[in-house]
Amino acid sequence: MTSLQYFSLNRPVFPATHLHRPGIRHLQVSACANVEVQAPSSVKKQGVSKEVMEAAGRVLVGTYARVPVVLSRGKGCKLYDPEGREYLDLSAGIAVNVLGHADSDWLRAVTEQAATLTHVSNVFYSIPQVELAKRLVASSFADRVFFSNSGTEANEAAIKFARKFQRFTRPDEKQPATEFVSFSNSFHGRTMGSLALTSKENYRSPFEPVMPGVTFLEYGNIEAATQLIQRRKIAAVFVEPIQGEGGVYSATKEFLYALRKACDDSGTLLVFDEVQCGLGRTGYLWAHEIYDVFPDIMTLAKPLAGGLPIGAVLVTERVASAITYGDHGTTFAGGPLVCKAALTVLDKILRPGFLASVSKKGHYFKEMLINKLGGNSHVREVRGVGLIVGIELDVSASPLVNACLNSGLLVLTAGKGNVVRIVPPLIITEQELEKAAEILLQCLPALDRHG
């Protein structure tokens, strides 16, 4: 039975009692001029999405302010709702689906592995896990890998590794380094440790007290960071080479170099969070390669398995030597299925010419956006590297994002809500980028209507 059949049963699946959902904002979107909007094919089919959304309102916890769209299938850079309406996907599941949807090589690898072995615990060895670790080590600064299930879990592991490292390397100190440095506009996750490293106060405040000992500094402020690292007992500095959720801000080489030097001088670990910006998105395999500055620990997740849940913590031998049996663990992480999927993603990204094509398409797209949108009074800046692009506005980005949605284009917001974030599948074509730029241009008047 398909999901569409399930939600089309004549007999109600759930009680018919109406449940009001307070606090959930229902977005109102309107079509943009000169952009064709496909109409739902029938009243009957319209009901499928309606039934799904109504059922979700009854049974799901209201943690997401969802847009009123149900996505039921995808191919390449296109997504479709149950009514058959097509969307050009420049969100990629928030920088996850780097190979697009239903990539044939990825699908074959996952199907074959699922028919062979899906899950074993980490009490045992499995071939795909070891092979993936070997590939990650061979293509990075790292010597060893710890697998997790998500980006926030990867950062939680990095927190624990940093504290254990400080105790291991300085056993005679009565009070080893336990504090952390993070930066403005940072996002490192939503579990209690990684949440403590996330700068946005409204993410943290409902759950206070979170992990103590975190100091937030201005992103890019070399003097403040250097002084604090030298003065305090800092276990690790967490930094995103390119901030995605924070608004698509790129670090400077001088800033990352200064962090590296200050950490080396003080015995502090440097952690690069590349959960969103890593694995080819910038046109480099790792975002920090742009700057020629290397960390002690790097956390990965979103794109690694091409849509399946995975995270990874890459560490040097120096860090790994501090970690022993029982220091950390997880039931599901590094399973054969997700690791086989990740091997396929890595294989395709590392093919000759793939990363160069990402860089080329990213440059082409950014220049096109500057030319098409730069003259609009609401557009402050178009920035980014490769295929992580931000369009900063002087007003809320929501009206533009919503109008694009209604016109068949999926993009995201970021920063303080005034940045349009674009993180498409890395396989996107120049023609698809041109179409996206044209829709963005045609939808700009939505900013005036809601200004």
UniProtKB/Swiss-Prot annotation:
CDD domains tied to this protein: OAT_like
Location, primary (coarse class): mitochondrion
GO molecular function, one term: pyridoxal phosphate binding
Any GO BP annotation: L-arginine biosynthetic process
Domain of life of the source: Eukaryota
Catalysis performed (reactions): N(2)-acetyl-L-ornithine + 2-oxoglutarate = N-acetyl-L-glutamate 5-semialdehyde + L-glutamate
Catalytic activity, EC: 2.6.1.11
Pfam families the record matches: Aminotran_3
Residues bearing the modification N6-(pyridoxal phosphate)lysine: 302
Pathway: Amino-acid biosynthesis; L-arginine biosynthesis; N(2)-acetyl-L-ornithine from L-glutamate: step 4/4
Class of this enzyme: transferase
HAMAP family noted in UniProt: ArgD_aminotrans_3
Entries under PANTHER family matching the protein: ACETYLORNITHINE AMINOTRANSFERASE, MITOCHONDRIAL (PTHR11986:SF79), AMINOTRANSFERASE CLASS III (PTHR11986)
Similarity annotation: Belongs to the class-III pyridoxal-phosphate-dependent aminotransferase family.
Function: Involved in the biosynthesis of citrulline.
The name this protein goes by in its record: Acetylornithine aminotransferase, mitochondrial
Organism expressing this protein natively: Alnus glutinosa
Taxonomic path: Eukaryota, Viridiplantae, Streptophyta, Embryophyta, Tracheophyta
